[in-house]
């Protein structure tokens, strides 16, 4: 795997700001960090993250050349039904898949350039994209 394919993104701890870099877990202090990339706001520095927002780059880009991460919400251009898909890791298949509300597909069935990233489910915890409604709290 190339180094650029190991990139993750997450929100900074106690912030809504997203950062990208390399994931590091400090097992002694039980803290999660990202070693920031040069193009980040803060350069070459460890920044603590909210581990619940951690998203892994899957090594592919969408039709707009946007990197695709786990937990991204995508639509597929050539789908007859307008459906949202969530990019998720499937342990049984040992690969990232597109999980929709009616079916699941993998990137063997679709070219990533047929997909468009429209958001990330981490950014919209109150919205159930697969069932297309606001969760009642």
Regions found by a protein language model. Name each.
Residues 1-137:
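Secondary-structure transition motif
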């Amino acid at each position: 795997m190339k180094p650029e394919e190991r990139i993750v993104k997450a929100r900074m701890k106690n912030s809504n700001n997203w950062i990208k870099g390399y994931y590091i877990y400090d097992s002694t202090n039980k803290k999660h960090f990202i070693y920031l990339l040069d193009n980040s706001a803060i350069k070459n520095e460890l920044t603590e993250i909210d581990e619940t927002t951690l998203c892994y780059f899957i090594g592919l880009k969408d039709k707009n050349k946007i990197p695709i991460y786990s937990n991204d919400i995508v639509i597929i251009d050539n789908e007859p039904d307008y459906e949202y898909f969530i990019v998720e890791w499937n342990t049984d298949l040992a690969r990232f898949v597109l999980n929709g509300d009616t079916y699941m597909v993998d990137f063997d069935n679709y070219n990533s350039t047929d997909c468009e990233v429209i958001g990330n489910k981490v950014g919209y915890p109150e919205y159930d994209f697969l069932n297309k409604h606001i969760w009642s709290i």
